[in-house]
Amino acid sequence: MEQRHWKKAGITTSLLGYGCMRLPTLPDGRIDEVRAEALLNTARDAGVNYFDTAYPYHGGESEPFVGRVIAKWPRESFYLATKLPLWQCDSLEKAQQIYRSQFERLGVDTIDFYLLHSLHRARYDQAKALGIVDWLWEEKKAGRIRNFGFSCHDNADGLEHILRDQPWDFCQLQYNYLDTDDRAEEIAGDRGYALTEELGIPLIIMEPIKGGTLANLPPDAAAPLTALDPAASAASWALRWVGSHKNVHLILSGMSAEEQLADNLSTFAPFRPLNAAEDAAVAETARILHSRIKIGCTGCRYCMPCPMGVDIPDNFSIWNRLGMFGQPDAVRHQWTARFPDAEKASHCVRCGKCEAVCPQHLPIRTALAQLQTELDAL
């Protein structure tokens, strides 16, 4: 198992970390604890020593489940990470209440990596004003937290504001070979990665396979990769691309099935950084996927709020997923079962306020009508 050394912390973790957000589930939605525990045990036996959970994962059941599993392991054999859901913390007292409950749910006295969950600039500033950030540094001094950091869903400007404000032990970003542009509202991209390198802040990567979408590529997009290695999975290319960046200390993958775990273990044992030809092939795959985009929305949200309640960027995100990856069944489920009807493109009255402020000068009204027709037809 490939390992990475954390110089400041003086520890060594597996490069692959187990994300406990997408564990296998039963038909009623509860965690399939027999299968999930077997997966975690298999990962640990193969050398994975970092396990990541969070207060809200699996409807609040991930932390207690992980706690029951790790109770059977020697404490020194793994590193545990969890996160504070700041959107549920309107006061320092509420944050402290949740924090204390996490130790009980996990059954531990110390948490190795503690994160402020899903930060953007405004959420960070609020947490700081409430005293939550200073209090957690005190918790680290007391030894209840060993490493203090955050996960971030903001662009590079927002990330830089947060990074430069504290002596963080680490940070966690979404990064993959498609999410390299920092213009989108929630993506720091290449610029965000470069910031962590410049500041010497160890980086943990989430969504290296972009929620699984980079594991199922259309044939034309996969062609540059399969030409070099027909046997390699699409997921392995995405993971190797991320792991080839020198400041990446750990890559999280939310493995929900045995075959996913087996494939990832083979990617990381042994791990092979991309060579020049392989890096060029991944870049060509990314170019092909970007060429299939339906509309060049960057997710900047200058068009929001829509007076009719249409979530314009999220409509475009689903439409672009269909264009880039196909996957009509997955897109249909997202559109019909998970996307609120009140926010769909059908509510557009063509007022044009969105187009007046769009920095990309996109034909938003025409595109909304087209996407509604295409997605409804799935």
Give the residues covered by each predicted segment.
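Conserved, mostly hydrophobic/aromatic
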Residues: 6, 18, 43, 51, ...
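Active-site mouth loops of central-metabolism enzymes
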Residues: 22-34, 83-93, 122-125, 222-229
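Beta/alpha (TIM)-barrel catalytic core signal, keyed to glycine-rich beta->alpha loops juxtaposed to Asp/Glu
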Residues: 119-298, 302-310, 314-317, 326-340, ...
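Active-site groove signature of glycoside hydrolases
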Residues: 103-124
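Short, acidic/polar
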Residues: 30-43, 91-106, 153-162, 234-239
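Local cysteine-cluster metal-coordination motifs and their immediate loop/turn environment
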Residues: 294-309, 345-361
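N-terminal binding-site loop/beta-alpha segment at the start of enzyme catalytic domains
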Residues: 1-78, 135, 141
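Short Fe-S-cluster ligation motifs
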Residues: 325-353, 377-378
